[in-house]
Curated annotation (Swiss-Prot):
The keyword Cytoplasm applies. It comes from the Eukaryota. The lineage of its organism: Eukaryota, Fungi, Dikarya, Ascomycota, Taphrinomycotina. It is found in: Cytoplasm; Mitochondrion; Nucleus. Residues 108-122, 136-153, 201-226 have a biased composition (Polar residues). Keywords: Cytoplasm, Mitochondrion, Nucleus. It comes from Schizosaccharomyces pombe (strain 972 / ATCC 24843) (Fission yeast). Residues 154-172 have a biased composition (Basic and acidic residues). GO terms for cellular component: cytosol; endosome; mitochondrion; nucleus. The keyword Nucleus applies. This is Uncharacterized protein C19G7.18c. Residues 108-252 are annotated as: Disordered. GO terms for biological process: endocytosis.
Length: 252
């Protein structure tokens, strides 16, 4: 927090005056002082209240820790409210709040990008020794490089950033079934799975639509006679009769 606070005060785009910087530094010191005081009071208050009572040490220490955390929170909230009221009482209070808000927005944008701005006047400076999470280390290389190399490095950084945020590249299908779905979607065919049709293979839809399809079903004018068509059925009938009646002749 001290790092971001110092960067906010020293940001050239904010243009804080010396009086405003002194006021903000005093407000920061007030927050630290009251936070420590609140933690001490919250930690020691249960010890003072339980001095004449029989309380187990573990329970007493746990209550003291909880009291210290509660005192810290109460002190921070109270001090923040006091600082805001003190800012509003100043003539330039709204200007200070606007500068703080603009600085916080720039800091958040810089952290989301994960890299430092190219200009040293922006927050944070490029030659800073502090590295934000996800930022690339500064190797001191010259900025005048091949634009093709810069574009490749930018693409690599974007790919790494997308993987870190849970986004995957959907340009390639994840499986064979997804490739089939994509191909059916592009060709407008709703059948699944998809297969290529050629002149030798007819669609089953045309066979059931009432059209003539000699390759799917035999036509009425086929050369196959009724005897040849009934031959497998007659063999099955004879086998059945022989099994039941012990006779090769069919039963009437």
């Amino acid at each position: 927090m001290d790092f971001f606070w110092e960067r906010m005060l020293n940001d050239p785009q904010n243009h804080f005056s010396d009086d405003q910087k002194e006021f903000l530094n005093h407000a920061k010191y007030r927050v630290k002082r009251n936070t420590i005081f609140g933690m001490l009071v919250g930690f020691s208050l249960p010890l003072y209240l339980a001095r004449n009572k029989k309380v187990t040490p573990i329970r007493l220490y746990a209550t003291s820790i909880i009291g210290g955390l509660a005192g810290n929170g109460v002190a921070q909230i109270t001090t923040l409210a006091y600082n805001l009221s003190a800012i509003r009482q100043r003539d330039d209070g709204f200007e200070i709040l606007r500068k703080i808000q603009d600085s916080l927005i720039r800091q958040r944008t810089t952290m989301r990008q994960g890299r430092f701005p190219s200009s040293s006047s922006e927050f944070p400076p490029k030659n800073s020794k502090y590295q934000l999470p996800g930022s690339m280390p500064n190797t001191g290389a010259s900025s005048s490089q091949d634009p093709f190399t810069n574009s490749q490095s930018t693409e690599k950084e974007d790919a790494m950033y997308s993987k870190d945020n849970g986004f995957e590249d959907r340009s390639k299908p994840a499986s064979a079934w997804e490739a089939i779905r994509n191909r059916n979607r592009n060709t407008g065919n709703n059948s699944f799975p998809f297969y290529e049709e050629d002149s030798s293979v007819k669609s089953t839809d045309s066979a059931f639509s009432g059209q003539e399809n000699s390759e799917a079903f035999p036509s009425r004018t086929s050369n196959l006679g009724s005897e040849q068509l009934d031959e497998p059925i007659s063999h099955e009938q004879e086998a059945f009769d022989q099994l039941i009646w012990n006779d090769s002749s069919s039963s009437k």
